Amino acid sequence: MSEQTAPAGGEPIRFDTKIAVLLREDLQVWQRLNVCAFLMSGIAAGNPETIGEPYADADGTAYLSMFRQPVVVLEGGKEMLALAHGRALDRELSTAVYTADLFMTGNDRDNRAAVRAVGRDALDLVGVAVFGRKNAVDKVMKGAVMHP
């Protein structure tokens, strides 16, 4: 996933960075989508270099910019999330977390308070997203499987 096909006749674009999100395997579909969306907003907000140029269609209608590179979506058990979280912090990668408590809140202030109330090793993680050098992200996510 470190390569993107270029338009006809162009060379593939290769990335030395990677964006990956790890979701807990026991989440309901709506929870997976919600967690992924929130985590990706964190990666985008904390890493403006991940954002590409604005889009436009053939009629000139403008659309918002999106990530400049693919996002790898993985899944794993509770232990895998804890392991990946620790690895990401040890490697000082840009990291976003989503805990089970956030399903009970309805705004950013309460979300931040819910995370702040629990120590790092006791967080009930349901999602972790990371951005960094490709090889470092691969090491962080080692053992996780591709999301179906």
Which residues does each predicted region cover?
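Positively charged, small/polar-rich N-terminal and surface patches that mediate targeting and assembly
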Residues: M1-P148
